[in-house]
Amino acid sequence: MSDIHSLLVAAILGVVEGLTEFLPVSSTGHMIIVGHLLGFEGDTANTFEVVIQLGSILAVVVMFWRRLFGLIGIHFGKPPAHEGQGSGRLSLIHILLGMIPAVVMGLIFHDTIKSLFNPVNVMYALIVGGVLLIAAEVLKPKQPRAVGIDDMTYRQAFVIGCFQCLALWPGFSRSGATISGGMLMGVSRYAASEFSFLLAVPMMMGATVLDVYKSIGFLNMGDVPMFAVGFVMAFIVALIAIKTFLQLIKRISFIPFAIYRFIVAAAVYVVFF
């Protein structure tokens, strides 16, 4: 690829990554389709996708930096505003409980999970994840037991972590799994989304660093500009996407996202079959 072409491809994929990483629509499904259409596939493409995820993670850190530092007892000025009706407070224990199930499952079945990265499995994951979103909207308690993120219990955090295991299935969507699990456990749509974003930082950071380490042999200095463009675009777009998403879910349900997932699944079928 020419330099200009490779930078353009990097910018497009950075936008796709940033736009879809934290929405319940599966960034994996979108990256597979767009990467295929752009002719950007193989080991370098896989490493590129892993690296630009760091841009999306950085966007969450920037958005929730005060809350993240507060979880480890570091406060700059006033503590983050209390979000809830009770007197509880989200703690690092909630995050750890939300991480444990997927970390354990991911370590045990790492090689099996990697073997699932193909269009067929992604297509089915998109469909099943869409059904789960609809089920969460239909079956969730009429009155959430955790209105704000600080109302969440340890049990709710752990069960959300169990739902996160579904995201080990490529194409399922980590945010879709965790948000659906939270809503079914009586966490409000907004609080479940916030917790999903906070949970993403250690989960994605750990997985990304591990993948980068294992892919280091496919990196070379000539790829740095392309990777940098993808990283920056993913960061900027993810920042905008997160802000917009949190405002949007105050007004609409996740049904439109579920329908969109079915459309993407159909697109995967058309493109690859």
UniProtKB/Swiss-Prot annotation:
InterPro entries recorded: UppP
Enzyme class: hydrolase
Stretch forming the signal peptide: none
Keyword annotations: Antibiotic resistance, Cell inner membrane, Cell membrane, Cell shape, Cell wall biogenesis/degradation, Hydrolase, Membrane, Peptidoglycan synthesis, Transmembrane, Transmembrane helix
Residues passing through the membrane, by range: 13-35, 45-65, 90-110, 116-136, 157-177, 190-210, 222-242, 252-272
Record's subcellular location: Cell inner membrane
Coiled coil feature spans: none
Protein name listed in UniProt: Undecaprenyl-diphosphatase
Source organism of the structure: Klebsiella pneumoniae subsp. pneumoniae (strain ATCC 700721 / MGH 78578)
Lineage of the species this protein comes from: Bacteria, Pseudomonadati, Pseudomonadota, Gammaproteobacteria, Enterobacterales
